[in-house]
Amino acid sequence: MIKWAIIFFVISVIAGLLGFTGVAAGAAGIARVLFYIALAIFLIVLVFGVLLGVLVF
């Protein structure tokens, strides 16, 4: 998921440099959502790993 967030971030930067502000804003929004979803999943797995004391993966 982080890979897709980075891809959409790069798309938004390139689109912003070329003047396509609508595309840049859309891609940046998608990248932000994917990043926060990946961060939430990471934190949930981290908390379960610490609380249960087992290796999750």
Swiss-Prot record:
Compartments, as annotated in UniProt: Cell membrane
What organism is this sequence from?
A: Aromatoleum aromaticum (strain DSM 19018 / LMG 30748 / EbN1) (Azoarcus sp. (strain EbN1))
Q: What residues form the membrane-spanning segments?
A: 4-24, 37-57
The record gives the membrane topology as: Multi-pass membrane protein
Q: Does the keyword Coiled coil apply?
A: no
HAMAP family documented for this protein: UPF0391
Q: Which family does it belong to?
A: Belongs to the UPF0391 family.
Q: Which UniProt keywords apply?
A: Cell membrane, Membrane, Transmembrane, Transmembrane helix
**Name of this protein:** UPF0391 membrane protein AZOSEA39630
Pfam families tied to this protein: DUF1328
Q: What are the record's GO terms for cellular component?
A: plasma membrane
